[in-house]
């Protein structure tokens, strides 16, 4: 007698066996992250927190935002997104094999170690006055960030 086990598509398009045939009798679970109705408000709050942090840190470190405010806006939005999803403002301008491990290590959490030690910001968020791309501003409005990032 032959038995056939049918599969269904699970998380990430991977096949999974039906619950009745799962190994060791435990059902397989898949966490699906969905945006709730209040997700935009939550993200707006994080963007505002990161905006205020960026302005304060720029003043404290005597650095300036990029002359192209779109760069500043995108980086602040990326920091806010990482703060929401990872619990820390991990530098959004780098590739990580394991973001959770990077957050735990803290090296690339904003302000990152190179910024704190040598005033070197890979993201071009905090630029020294002698940098060719440095603007004259240490402030950016929430509206500027929303407008610049609404296209993405």
UniProtKB/Swiss-Prot annotation:
Cleavable signal peptide: none
Catalysed reaction equations from the record: [thioredoxin]-disulfide + 2 reduced [2Fe-2S]-[ferredoxin] + 2 H(+) = [thioredoxin]-dithiol + 2 oxidized [2Fe-2S]-[ferredoxin]
Residues with site note (Increases the nucleophilicity of the active site Cys): 122
Intrachain disulfide bonds: 93-123
Cofactor(s) essential for the protein: [4Fe-4S] cluster
Gene3D superfamilies reported in the protein's UniProt record: Ferredoxin thioredoxin reductase catalytic beta subunit
Its job: Catalytic subunit of the ferredoxin-thioredoxin reductase (FTR), which catalyzes the two-electron reduction of thioredoxins by the electrons provided by reduced ferredoxin.
Family: Belongs to the ferredoxin thioredoxin reductase beta subunit family.
Protein name: Ferredoxin-thioredoxin reductase catalytic chain, chloroplastic
Naturally occurring in which organism (per UniProt): Zea mays (Maize)
């Amino acid at each position: 007698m032959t038995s056939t086990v049918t599969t269904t598509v699970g998380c990430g398009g991977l096949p999974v066996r039906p619950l009745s045939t799962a190994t060791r009798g435990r059902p397989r679970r898949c966490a699906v992250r969905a945006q709730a109705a209040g997700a935009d408000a939550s993200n707006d709050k994080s963007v505002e927190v990161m905006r205020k942090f960026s302005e304060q840190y720029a003043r404290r470190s005597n650095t300036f935002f990029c002359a192209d405010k779109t760069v500043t806006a995108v980086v602040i939005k990326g920091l806010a997104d990482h703060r929401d999803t990872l619990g820390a403002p991990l530098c959004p301008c780098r590739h990580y094999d394991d973001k959770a491990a990077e957050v735990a290590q803290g090296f690339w959490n904003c302000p990152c170690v190179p910024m704190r030690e040598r005033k070197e910001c890979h993201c071009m968020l905090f630029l020294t006055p002698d940098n060719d791309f440095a603007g004259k501003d240490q402030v950016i409005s929430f509206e500027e960030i929303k407008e610049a990032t609404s296209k993405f």
